[in-house]
Curated annotation (Swiss-Prot):
It catalyses: 1-(5-phospho-beta-D-ribosyl)-ATP + H2O = 1-(5-phospho-beta-D-ribosyl)-5'-AMP + diphosphate + H(+). GO terms for cellular component: cytoplasm. The keyword Cytoplasm applies. Pathway: Amino-acid biosynthesis; L-histidine biosynthesis; L-histidine from 5-phospho-alpha-D-ribose 1-diphosphate: step 2/9. Its EC number is 3.6.1.31. It comes from Pseudarthrobacter chlorophenolicus (strain ATCC 700700 / DSM 12829 / CIP 107037 / JCM 12360 / KCTC 9906 / NCIMB 13794 / A6) (Arthrobacter chlorophenolicus). This is Phosphoribosyl-ATP pyrophosphatase. HAMAP family: HisE (MF_01020).
């Protein structure tokens, strides 16, 4: 099972190696603006799932939001430690 750290390591590897057809690479190539739009979209989907859908659906939407937030972190050059110090 993935956790926040293993997901970040996996995404960092994809950002470094840029495998062809990678969704992560495509999202990074869309830049901070494009990634930010995706974060906003996913945040709305989290809210809607939490409000109107099952716990399973809400958990899935939250996982997708976490993915896009980590891609945004990579695009900005942020590390997990950069974020953790604000928790």
């Amino acid at each position: 099972m993935k956790n926040f750290e293993t997901l970040f390591a996996e995404l960092s590897e994809k950002a470094a190696t840029r495998p062809e057809g990678s969704r992560t690479v495509a999202e990074l190539d869309s830049g901070v603006h494009g990634i930010g739009k995706k974060v906003v979209e996913e945040a709305a989907e989290v809210w809607m799932a939490a409000e109107y859908e099952s716990d399973e659906a809400a958990a899935e939407e939250i996982s997708q939001l976490l993915y896009h937030l980590q891609v945004l972190m990579l695009a900005k050059g942020l590390t997990l430690e950069d974020v953790y110090k604000h928790l």
